[in-house]
Amino acid sequence: MNKILINTPERNKQLIDSYGRTIDYLRISVTDRCNFRCTYCMPENMKFLPKDDLLTFEEMDNLCSLFIARGIKKIRLSGGEPLARKGLIDFISNLSRFISYGDLKEITLTTNGSLLNKMSKQLYDSGIRRINVSLDTLIKDKFYQITRRDDLENVINGIMTAKNNGLKIKINTVVIKNKNFNEINEIIEWAHKNDFDISLIETMPMGLTDQDRIDQYVSLIDVEKEI
């Protein structure tokens, strides 16, 4: 693919927010589909967008090119589960040309980890160097309760495979009342032992999945007291 708009007059017009801060980070959801059904995220019978309503990868590439021309330096790909969308690796490989041009610093990705066993080497080869993995528990039964999928062993193996394939890993853990709140210290210890960064995240106390999310909410103030 050719460079798009990188050498046009628009190149120097950086994006500025209402507080005068330069915007250099873009997050793109490549799909709303996911192979998990986390209780704080979506119901079991989730109705997804028609595929024709999603941007094609060519359209996403053009969109990214426009943002890069306005000063975006970092792009994060997310979903849904981004690795579930066919053609993602080719999209990343094409987008990585901007890294080689010096116009983009990095492309990162957020995943639930379920497809890392098969795809982590492809991710590395396509230009990805860092990934975030959503992991809320290290206990098999709890994992099923949270994700509605019996896939913990595969996810853990996938994370380790990704590490062995050269990817830097950050664990994202959503803290959930009566689910993993009393396990947080163990998760942090496991992450640090394996040289993973970790972020603890509040579940948003709004909206409905199968239940009001306020029932699952734990403030980070309470988490700090726990650890």
What are these regions (language model features)?
Residues 178-179, 199-220:
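Flexible glycine/acidic-rich beta-alpha junction loops that bind and position SAM and/or redox cofactors
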Residues 46-50, 139-146, 207-211:
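A short acidic, helix-capping loop that chelates divalent metal ions and anchors anionic groups
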Residues 2-107:
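Conserved alpha-helical substructure of the radical SAM core
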Residues 31, 43-44, 134-136, 201-203:
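Generic beta-structure capping elements
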Residues 165-166, 218-227:
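C-terminal accessory region of radical SAM enzymes
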Residues 54-57, 149, 214-217, 221:
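Short, conserved loop/turn and helix-capping segments at secondary-structure boundaries
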Residues 28, 93, 185, 221, ...:
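Active-site phosphate/pyrophosphate- and oxyanion-stabilizing loops and adjacent acidic/basic residues
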Residues 57-77, 84-201:
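Radical SAM/AdoMet-radical enzyme domain recognition
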